[in-house]
Amino acid sequence: SMDGDLKEIDLERRSVDLRPVRTKRLRDGSHTIGYLRITQFSESVPRKIEEALEELNEKEVEGIILDLRNNSGGLVSSGIAVADCFLNKKLIVETKNREGIKDSIISEEDTTFNGPMVTLVNSGTASASEILAGALQDNNRSALIGKQTYGKGLIQSLKSLTDDSGIAITVASYLTPNGNNIQGRGIIPDKILDFNEAKDFGSSEDKWVKNAEIYLSSILDKKELQNNEIKISDKA
C-alpha cells in the first residue's frame, strides 16, 4: 500500500484461451450455418482456417459467419492469406507509398469456401482484420455487420537513433480494393448494430451472432427462392 504496509490479496486464476481460430456449427431454422472466429492473425492461422473451412464443408454448412470482433491484427501476410480462402482472383489490398506509387495484391484462383457469408466487426477490429474485412466488403463477397472498425492502416519502418532509441516512420498506407484509406477512418459496416456486445463472443447469449444468423438466413432463403423459380421455369 502507499503507507508501506504489506497486504495480502486473493487472485482468481483463469485459463487463457490461446486458440486463434474457433469454429462451430449453428442451426437457424432450416439452415445449417458455420461460425468461424479469428482472434488474431498469427503464422499458423491460414492453415487452421483452411482446415476449419474444409471441416465445415464436410458438415455441409450452407453459409458462414466470420467473426473478427476485437481482432487487433497481427501478421498482415496471414490476414491476406485468409482473404485468399474466400476470394477468387480478386484484388485484396493495395499499398500506397509516400510517392503515391501503388502495389496490388491479388488473390489466387482457388477458394476454400465459396458459399454465402457475413462478417462481424467492431471498434476492436484493426490492421490485418480491417484488410480482410475491406477485401470481403469491396468485392461484394461478404456483408459487414456490427460497428465501425478501428482504422489502423499504416506501414511503418523503425529507424534507429544514436542514443539507442528509435523512431517509427510511415512509409506506406493500406487501401481497400475500392481505394478507401483505412488509417484513421476504419471501415463502416453494411449493417450497424447499436446494442451491447456479449462478454463471451460466440456464446448462446451473443445477440450479434444471432443477428448475423438472421441476416445470413435471409440470404439463403432468397437463394432457395431463386433456385425454385428457376426449376419452375424449366418445367414450363
Locate predicted features:
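Conserved functional hotspot residues or short segments at active or partner-binding sites
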Residues: 181-236
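Short acidic, Pro/Gly- and aromatic-enriched capping/linker segments at domain boundaries
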Residues: 163, 168-172
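A short, sequence-level motif marking secondary-structure junctions
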Residues: 12-17, 174, 189-190
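Metal-dependent DNA phosphodiester-chemistry modules and their immediately adjacent helices/loops
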Residues: 127, 177-182
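Cleft-lining beta-strand/loop regions that shape enzyme active-site pockets
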Residues: 1-162
